[in-house]
Amino acid sequence: MVSSEPKGPANVANTASPLKAHESSGKRANGQKFKPGGAGGARKFDKFGGGAGKSFVKPGAGGAKKFDKSGPGGFKKFDKSGATGDKRLGGNKFRGKPQTQPQAPAEGEKQDWNKFKKEKKDLKLKRKSAKDTYEISKEANQIHEKLRCRRTENKDKLVEQIYKVLNVGDTISKVVKAHDTARVIQSMLKYASPALRAEISEKLLPFTVEMCQSKYAQFCVQRMLKYGAPATKAKLVDSLYGHIVRLAGHSIGSGLLDSMYQSATPNQRIYMRQEFYGDLYRKAKDSNVKTLSDTYKEATNMKASILGSVKANLDHVANKQLVDSALVHAVMLEYLRACDEDEEKLEETVTAFAALVPHMLSTKEGSEAAVICFYKSTPKNRRAIIKNIKEHLLKIANHEHGHVFLISLLNALDDTKATKKAIYDHLHGDLKALMSSPYGRRVIQWLVAPGDTTCFHPEFIRTVEEGLAFGKKEKELRRKEILEQIEAPIAQSIAEDAAFWLSNSHIGLVTGDILNHIQGESYEKAASALAQVVVQPEWRISADAAGPQPQDKKKPHNDVEAIIAQATKQRRKLLYVESSSDDEDEDEDEDEESDDEGDEKEQKEAAADDAEPKVKKAKKEPKKPKAKEEEPAAPLVSGIEEAGMHIVLKKILKNDGKREGTPFSQQLLQNLSSDVLKAWLGVNRACFVLLKLVEECPALLDDCKKAIAAERSLSQILADRKTPGAKLLAAKLDIGK
């Protein structure tokens, strides 16, 4: 408020006098402070005085006006506590409205738990019945109970009944996200006729994006992918356009997106990848853009912005740790190839994906992208990548695409000691598991025979050796150092269980490569153990050298109904065989359940009358699940007669002529007993093995002659045999002339 007193020198003197007094006396004892005020006088701040609070004194025409927090003229108080005045005592804005929770018992009163449970159950039922789809869902679930029964026939008729119930407005789109009715939709998609399945799918297609992000509706999308016709699957992929990047970063949708990408047509895959290139391609697709480089082929000035968009989308997916997807792997590979010149962006991307390399090795594109990440990363990032794959080394080595990354890593590292410590030492304890896998064997072969064209395809060798440009050490020196460090542990493993290393022809080929490359004591230790296995009279190997047959990679037949019908026929045959025994078991189970219910009632009545309850009948022990039929073991054949092992032995003997000391051929001949030699002379392939032995090691020719001539029967057997191997061996040893 403006003062009415005239402004002048006297007024200035009045305002200055308290200031002088303050300067002379300093602070007062009661803690009051004075500061110069405005033109109208002094402003007083009573902070520590005896007043009730902070007061502001301001002169005006009608006298001093005070602003105080407390007192009759203070601030207005708002009562937020409710009707009781205190929120802690139960006052709230919902007072007077019906309570949704059962009332708690009064103090000192015992809780009636049966009543409490009943009230909770009634409340739950009341909440459910308030929904507009409650009655429809209830009826659909009742029919579904019959549909899901294994013995129910004409299931397609029941599906039609459920569809009539649910086909009211947008009911299907509502119930598909619920935990119970989502199972109903799944069964409908499974057992419906082709026409009805297509109709149900058409109803669900507009909500595909929402279903892919739903906890329960996602399984309906899986059913559409599994049982839907090719046209339905194509529409399913088309319905995701515009939301690909968002689904790729969703914890539930990423898995479904990966399944759809793998089942999509080539053009659909291109369109799905285009959405990672930027917002321009989310709604408008370009059939001329096949890869990322096509987007800026005609407008190079847009390259930086497009690569920035791709990087942002990849970083979003990497932050969610959802990179285990063929779609993400394909985009990642295109991006790494495109930003080869921009080292700054490349380094940022490599750093972001270094911890996620194990998840990138499930596809061919992901493995190639991981190799590029490793090649072009700094030493710090390389150590991080090696650290992250340590716990997954066995799985990576046995994987179709992961083993390529591991071989590329072994071929590019300069520090061979660190390579052995970080990689081979972790794999050494699982050598048998590696040798049992076709891809694990390739890792061992590369360690002992890197770049050998007899073991690896020239194109594979060329691809792996591209990493040599990112190392400093000479190729031959690096490979020699690795072999010197691992040959002793491998030889020790062979000596401990030589029979395994000759258990089939595929493992035997790798064993032969190992034996042909190791030197010195390691060779003699391994050769001695293997020779003792070969000369055993009961040496048997697995005839099924390839192990379990790989699954047929051909695309399944598109006629899903024929597949379902065939499976149903087989199931019915099994049901008819076991129908009588199952019916008897079910009758017994029903009798037991009714007896149990009657016994419980009797026990309650007896407890009320202080009587002893009747003894319950002993329940029938549940049937133990039948054990799955074990796959028949592969037949065993004589190792010396098996065609693949015959090649292995000849391969080992071929390099014995260059060896010094005691080669495998000499140890084989020394350990060969007369009984085994007699059996060998009657086998064509065994005769060729002996022929190869004396041809490659002429010094052993006389020893072989003496061994056969020691017993007249052996010479006679060899002379009487008419097989090609026996004839050539007899001619070489001058026997029978």
Curated annotation (Swiss-Prot):
InterPro entries: ARM-like (IPR011989), ARM-type_fold (IPR016024), CPL_dom (IPR012959), PUM-HD (IPR033133), PUM3 (IPR040059), Pumilio_RNA-bd_rpt (IPR001313). It comes from the Eukaryota. Residues 1-128, 577-638 are annotated as: Disordered. One of its GO terms (cellular component) is nucleolus. Residues 616-626 have a biased composition (Basic residues). Pumilio repeats lie at residues 167-202, 203-238, 239-274, 388-425, 426-462. SUPFAM superfamilies: ARM repeat. Gene3D superfamilies: Leucine-rich Repeat Variant. Residues 580-600 have a biased composition (Acidic residues). The keyword RNA-binding applies. Residues 139-490 form the PUM-HD domain. GO terms for molecular function: mRNA binding. GO terms for biological process: apposition of dorsal and ventral imaginal disc-derived wing surfaces; regulation of translation. Residues 76-89, 107-122, 601-615 have a biased composition (Basic and acidic residues). Keywords: Repeat, RNA-binding. This is Protein penguin.
